[in-house]
């Protein structure tokens, strides 16, 4: 069916009265007609310095809303929108909406004209960027994105993707020539001592502006009515094609009403896969953003709950509660469609729990969900959950892992590389990938623009046999890339660099790219093969060199942005002088996924240390989620652990460790002092704060690159010594001599390199039973032996240690 996309006389007369050129109206009509005909989005960027740009957006968006209202029924008939979506939904996003703010004034200028033209069948939601969590899982017809002052790249990714096919996006921007050289609120957040705002770069904004001009489907006008980039030809009608029919299986276990909610064949496949879960099993679902993945999972969860024909508990988890709003919303819609009256529990405006007769869905953080008893476990945005936590759900009777491959929370092949490979060894499961977009048609130009500007689909370079030979021979060199060149000239190296992070790290956000682009203290390093290919990516932050006045403030609680390691050393180790020293904090280091475990990471650290030494720096350090693999990597590369966070990260389920390696003699004294202090603390923390820390991790935290024993006096009374003799001679039991055993075990862990040899199992036993005070039953499970065997083993270990340290205590 062909529809007219032409603003009526009333709109044209009003626009004329407001001095809007007819050519600008025609440009907007054309953009809307193109969007409707292709079921894509179109974007109109309005450059300007005054409220006029917001007024112009109000007129153009109001006129567009009026046209869309007139064809709503037709869009529903063509299955381009749900029957429940019977209003034109408009989103206005800005940096501030408080009284007397410029953001508020622009919003009011927009509404003044929009409300006159849009008609009554329209709903406008205004949000600040801080509250964009409120819109996740929702869909809009028109978006007005006010980027006049502040925005973060994360906001950009999240907001743009809420607009459906057939919709328009209006961007309020400064004149490009001015914007290129402006600092935004995001830039101000990057200032850290000793830097000032003048040191902040503007690479990201310049890239964004360039991408507006490069991509199709984006038109640029000025608030004065000049078209800087316009369609090749005008268009005032659109042939609206129906969404292709989706065949519903003749025989279904779930109610047909649920299948009727599916808009693509991919969604039908997901529902069929959920039917198979009735008998138990595991489903892995991947998709690019906007493919209806979370929607399908929400509908499927309700179908499964009904098919089980019993009281059903469903645990839903994801990195953040925001991630599962579409899932909850469509689960609720599915229940309503079947005649239920669901009860919703919200937290800060977000759905957290959903209940209907004998059915309950509840969100838990990833590190808590697996501990709950349930009939189905759903892990949405699973690529954002740390791999050890993903494994905790693997043995559940029914489990669904669902993940975005590309998108603002994407993880490339990382999810497959890091998790699925190991999961296949443990159990069979069904894999589904959803290709067909649901919110808009394929090849949407705005999606292409977004993926390009935010590097959401960046991939590392492909490696050949010749490359692996170079890797084997370590024919590599470390280089500081020219970030001006990378960002301004859109070098392939930038995509390869970011691509390594996307595949290797469990969580990537667009702001990471902007941080690299603009933060004055952030730099990149790459490990290249002799032929120039990037195999290891390093992002570093220059820290330290902090003025004395700021250090005094830090000691009293002030937290300077960006100086994570100096701040920790001042607050936790009272080493104010450390904040004066300069060093590199390694923010992220990752190796090409096809070249892992070949020593490239260690080689990169070796070369970075050499560079730091030549530049006269004092230290190199890093902070990371403490897994056994990572702590071992840093310790084996000569780094000393100086801090461990008291609580686990709710998403990764890991404690954060901070490690340091001294370069200067001044730094060596301070870092050794901090490392000694940390080891002393850890012997106590393991029985309290870190009682649940995995012993295989704790074991590596005690390792030291300094090789010396901690100067920590251990005192045993004569009676305690006699009782230790009695214990090792099988006269007394362990439980009666714990007070005497613990100091000896502490001595062992605080000792230097010249200490008695214990194997890995024995070390874990001492940590788990003595320092963490777990029961004999739990300890026996840890080493997969009987309790009696475990008791004998512990006695034997203590006998050897007591024999060694007895002489030292006499001395």
Swiss-Prot record:
Keywords: Acyltransferase, ATP-binding, Cytoplasm, Nucleotide-binding, RNA-binding, rRNA processing, rRNA-binding, Transferase, tRNA processing, tRNA-binding. Acetyl-CoA binds at residues 589-591, 629, 636. GO terms for biological process: rRNA acetylation involved in maturation of SSU-rRNA; tRNA acetylation; tRNA wobble cytosine modification. InterPro entries: Acyl_CoA_acyltransferase, GNAT_dom, NAT10/TcmA_helicase, P-loop_NTPase, TmcA/NAT10/Kre33, TmcA_N, tRNA_acetyltr_TmcA. SUPFAM superfamilies: Acyl-CoA N-acyltransferases (Nat) (SSF55729), P-loop containing nucleoside triphosphate hydrolases (SSF52540). The keyword rRNA processing applies. It is found in: Cytoplasm. Belongs to the TmcA family. Catalyzes the formation of N(4)-acetylcytidine (ac(4)C) at the wobble position of tRNA(Met), by using acetyl-CoA as an acetyl donor and ATP (or GTP). This is tRNA(Met) cytidine acetyltransferase TmcA. It comes from Thermococcus sp. (strain AM4).
